[in-house]
Structure formats: C-alpha cells, structure tokens
Amino acid sequence: MNASGEYDSTSGLAQWANARYAPETSAECSSLATPAHTDESLTILTTLPEARAAVNTAASAAQRMISIYTPDLEPELYDQTAFLEIIKRFVLSRSFSKVRVLLVDPARVLRDSNRFVAMGRRLSSYIDIRYVAGHAPQRASAYLIADDRAIVYRLRADTWDGIADLNNHAVARLHLNEFDNVWNASAPDHALRVARRG
C-alpha cells in the first residue's frame, strides 16, 4: 500500500507475493530469485493412469540416475511393461546409469513375484534395491526422482494424489538429498539378494 492507502502493485513486497502466480513482466521483478522451472512442467495427479504416465515420463527423461522411494515397489506403477521397458533402455543404453530403490516394507516384494526385482537380478550392476534401515527416518510418501531435475511425488503412498514436476531442480534436489541420507544409512539387505537368486 502507498501513503494514500491504495494498493501499490509495484512495491517489492507485492511483487514477491504475486511472483508465484503471475509471470514476470517488469524489469523490477527480474531481480527477484525465481525457480528455474515453468508452471507447464507441474502436473497434479489424482488417478493411477496419471501417476503411471508421470512416472514413465520422468523416468524417460533421466540421463544418469533414477531414485525411487516406495513402500513395496508398488506393482501398479513399477511392475508395468511400459515402465520396465523404459528402465531397461535406460540402463542398457548408458554404461554409467544407475537405478536406486529404497523399500520401506519389503514383505510384499519377497512374497509376490515382481518383474522389477527380476530385472534387478539380471542387471544388478545397474539396479540396486535397499531396505530402509530401522533407524533411518521413514516417510509415508512415495516418489521417483530422475537425475536431479524431475520428480513425481505423492505425500501418501496409499493414494495416487500427488504432483509431477519434470523441471524443478530445487525440489528434486531437496528430496534427492533426503533420499541420499536414507540410502547411505541403509545397507543392502541379504534377504532381498537371496530372493533375487531364488
């Protein structure tokens, strides 16, 4: 507001408040720090087909690494032919590529047949699956991060509601740092390795 009590849309505070929702149009706004992504890269997810499409799109965009945090390798997402083909192409076309998976509750993976685990057995130098260590912080969320740019994130793993942002380095990096901390605290579990061979 200016001295006469009217709303002043050119003030720095007003520009900051509106920066998230309005495109930058003036030179004064250019000095504000803005994320390196566009609203077009953000998608709201509410259904399983939307979640599948987002996971497939993000994984297809990966160049170096895919990191997955999941309760049980959610077969509705990760045991699907389209996703498995994307992962296979990803790891076989790049000698330096890596897929890392953190499992919160591996009981279902050990009990049920899972094609992703079978692929991990065949391509063990590219696909690494670990259990979340008991002392590591566990989240109710589930997510996939491609490199350090694209993320498909669901606040609760028991629902398909979430977001997909294919070009948000800051948010992807934040969750990747969290993933790395849990990854480093979680050693590969021998039970899954035995299950892979059996």
How does the language model describe each region?
Residues N2-E74:
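Interdomain hinge/linker segments and adjacent boundary elements that couple functional modules
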Residues N2-L32, L155-G198:
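Signature of lipid phosphatidyltransferase scaffolds
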Residues A51-R52, F83, H175:
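Amphipathic coiled-coil/heptad-repeat helices and related helical stalk/stem segments
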Residues A58-L123:
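Primarily the HKD phosphodiesterase
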Residues T70, K98, L103, I127, ...:
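Long, hydrophobic, amphipathic alpha-helical segments used as structural scaffolds
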Residues D128-A172:
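HKD (HxKxxxxD) catalytic microenvironment of the phospholipase D
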